[in-house]
């Protein structure tokens, strides 16, 4: 079964709102075994909405549209559906009664006349009740395709999809169309390095066509999605398990988790299991490492606290760095990172100390180019240091540095080498 997703709203085209609905629908449809072949975004214009929806119905079996079902004058999905199908809009008395009852239940004596727009539907369209809001969805057949028009509010869209759309699509798909996915999460390696390590496996899977691999990179992390389609969930899971085992061998200790795991939660769990604590001394990252370590509930059990030693004076006064060291080596230096980490560890009585220093830009510092980053982790057994050279703007460099710091702490907790060990492609 082929599907397309159409997001409606000028605010999406202008970038005022991120199109999270499309991402959620893509995943939800894939889990139902529905192949999403195209996605589109169209502004608030009846003719253009009708044109985009019409083109989608000629290609796909199912079209899921979001947005444009509210009460205001720029909510035009109902009108566009009517124009596309060549039918009139009709006022649905049951929808109107439900809208009035909902407002009365909220203690609203005055029912805004504009809200009656939400009671209109194209002739032949079936309303989809909205238990999470006011605007109902619509189900409408156009040609050989079915259009599901859903509200743009994410919570309302998801509720209607789960209650009304997903069951119908699952029934239409029938057996033999289960699609499962598993995501392996790597850190500290480039997307190209991950792809190179998996090149032989990827080439083999490309010949088979099922399962498949896909790569998604962001901020120093690369996700590897393994997807398999089979007659039932057990068969699909078995296919994924085989590929996952081989992928983990190839990717080695660069894999830190799977599916919804986050590096913050993984580090928190490792600290908890070890009965260990951590403290942070940050320059380059300005408190972002501490923020990441407190992201997980129960962080106070493992995180002692931190210092943002952003200036030379702060490094000397709050962390006890020797002015002579800074004068000799500058603040962007691996030895400075080690002293910062050990100082905060000692001062706060933590098992581990983590420190960051570097150049986020826009200009060079201490003769070091933008993107130079040093991260240190100290403990009873001595220091571990990574020096990396990152690219991107100031914000991106800082976010990548946070991931490197968290990964270096993870590696220290697991007694792993400071840098990932990947298996390279066979020559």
UniProtKB/Swiss-Prot annotation:
Pfam families in alphabetical order: CinA, CinA_KH, MoCF_biosynth
CDD domains per record: cinA
Coiled-coil boundaries: none
InterPro entries registered for this protein in UniProt: CinA, CinA-like_C, CinA_C, CinA_KH, Competence-induced_CinA, MoaB/Mog-like_dom_sf, MoaB/Mog_dom
Disulfide bonding pattern of the chain: none
Gene3D superfamilies per UniProt: 3.30.70.2860, CinA-like, MoaB/Mog-like domain
Family: Belongs to the CinA family.
PANTHER family tied to this protein: NICOTINAMIDE-NUCLEOTIDE AMIDOHYDROLASE PNCC, NMN AMIDOHYDROLASE-LIKE PROTEIN YFAY
Name used for this protein in its record: CinA-like protein
Organism: Acidothermus cellulolyticus (strain ATCC 43068 / DSM 8971 / 11B)
